[in-house]
Amino acid sequence: MLNITLPDGSVRQYESPVTVAQIAASIGAGLAKAAVAGKVNGKLVDACDPITEDSSVQIITPKDQEGIEIIRHSCAHLVGHAVKQLYPNAKMVIGPVIEEGFYYDIATEKPFTPEDVAAIEARMKELIAQDYDVVKIMTPRAEAIKIFQERGEEYKLRLIDDMPEVEAMGMYHHQEYVDMCRGPHVPNTRFLKNFKLTKLAGAYWRGDSNNEMLQRIYGTAWATKDELKAYIQRIEEAEKRDHRKLGKQLDLFHLQDEAPGMVFWHPKGWALWQVIEQHMRKELNAAGYKEVKTPQIMDKTFWEKSGHWDNYKDNMFVTSSEKREYAVKPMNCPGHVQIFNNGLRSYRDLPMRLAEFGSCHRNEPSGALHGLMRVRGFVQDDAHIFCTEDQIVSEARAFNELLVRIYKQFGFHDVSVKLSLRPEKRAGSDDVWDKAEQGLREALTACGVEWGELPGEGAFYGPKIEYHVRDALGRSWQCGTLQLDFVLPERLGAEYVTENNDRARPVMLHRAILGSLERFIGILIENHAGSFPLWLAPVQLVIMNITENQADYCREVAAKLQAAGFRAELDLRNEKIGYKIRDNSQYRFPYQIVVGDKEKQENKVAVRRKAEDLGSLDLDDFIAQLQQEITDALVNH
């Protein structure tokens, strides 16, 4: 007899072997119908997989996150089924799950059109309506190869070649269509009703631009119709907030083919940039940082010594001059070590906090570039703290407090924390990594925050804490980082004189709050839908006259506002006031000021905030109100 322990601690006995589906059926008809898969001793399995020894078992349903991901994965297979029925010559490649969805890469003779995607979605719905069972058959390697050879699925054969150690493959049969996967998958297509294909894109085989271009069909799938509907609404809202669209509408920036991944900032966009940079500079000065500037281009030997050449050269731009090879810096850290090394440092100098709005370049694949979110040229709000091991926890705590306060100022109150651990390709010994990872765990504990851990996601030189902000649409963006590095100070010979007059290596904390300023501005645009808070808006007020009679008074109002530190623009065009209000509304300025004869006579201004008419206000009172609004945002949050 088999003893099966359920999540509530109860134990059920069965004849051996038994499947998850059979266990669910023995508990109740409702659970049997809802069972997508199972978790046996912590491992996900198909509902049809046999259990042959005493085990702990959890029935996975669409209410579980794992259940939703299995539904999405099975929807990817369903894309394959529909595509092969409609386009028999297409070659199926891979179809993984991604956040909130899935995709399938497909090799075709000619690119799919939006009409093709609509036809594929319609055929998927027809197949779901057939309510067929998805049948899993563990198939010997040689037989799996034969199946895909007969079907002409060359990419599946290449994938099998990548797995020389695998003796049997999970083959999932959707009627006549067969796909290969580790699984698990849904037992029946009835679980796949709440799906939608969302977009079409190109993708290179294995992500390498030297390889052939494939067609990538993206989709999403959910447990319920309401969840699908809510997701589609979020996507539609995200499209309205797209920073590329708003960047053009608000006249902030543009990009063009002659400078891929580089941004042309327009006056309003650069004003926004300057507000952010100057605010960060003020905060960093108050927190004890010293601002520095390091070279853009340095000799290749310097990058070899730092370890970047071995670990990062594919992402670096290189150039040569006078028979010397140079690289454009992809990050600022080695330059900051040079400043630390330029002079004899004492333990009394620590912690030393060096900050730089450092301009970096990384040779990102052209297909990966995306507006401001993924660029080749960018500026980081970078800083490096050189300290002793005893100072790690206090410096991490101070950084955490600074970061959380700044995020609140920008309107982000929901911050989650992840700890990224050692990657496979790394510098430094395991002992050094053990020490670094434990140091960050202790720092996070001291900050009183909860965190999740991400194995394999650290930088090559050290583990890192990642800070993720949640925006107005509920999306998570990784912005801030804190990385602990024992490796780079060793490689570049950083040292200080201890209290006992010995030499010691400092610990190096790499940290950023905004990350790339370009990307952070993209996130801000989408979070605020282009309607920035007063303190942040590139133009805070526009002042409009009704007739030429008020033009001089408008200039006086603008001068007084500008003298008080506000970014105000004049609109004295000879147009009707209704037109000017509508025209300026597209730029989403926080305030519009209208001046007529009455306001001019009474030394007042008629104020509009977005679509709301606030009436006529005394100018000095209005200025005081604006100042209080900024104080509330930056000091009182």
Curated annotation (Swiss-Prot):
One GO BP: threonyl-tRNA aminoacylation
InterPro entries attached to this UniProt entry: aa-tRNA-synt_IIb, aa-tRNA-synth_II, aa-tRNA-synth_II/BPL/LPL, Anticodon-bd, Anticodon-bd_dom_sf, Beta-grasp_dom_sf, TGS, TGS-like
EC numbers, comma separated: 6.1.1.3
Protein residues bound to Zn(2+): 333, 384, 510
Domain of life: Bacteria
Pfam families for this protein: HGTP_anticodon, TGS, tRNA-synt_2b, tRNA_SAD
Entry-linked SUPFAM superfamilies: Class II aaRS ABD-related (SSF52954), Class II aaRS and biotin synthetases (SSF55681), TGS-like (SSF81271), ThrRS/AlaRS common domain (SSF55186)
GO cellular component: cytosol
Cofactor note: Binds 1 zinc ion per subunit.
Known catalytic reactions: tRNA(Thr) + L-threonine + ATP = L-threonyl-tRNA(Thr) + AMP + diphosphate + H(+)
Known cofactor(s): Zn(2+)
Enzyme category, top tier: ligase
Primary subcellular site in the record, as a coarse category: cytoplasm
A GO term for molecular function: tRNA binding
Subcellular location: Cytoplasm
Family: Belongs to the class-II aminoacyl-tRNA synthetase family.
Assembly and oligomerization: Homodimer.
Name of this protein: Threonine--tRNA ligase
Native species: Neisseria meningitidis serogroup C (strain 053442)
Annotated gene: thrS
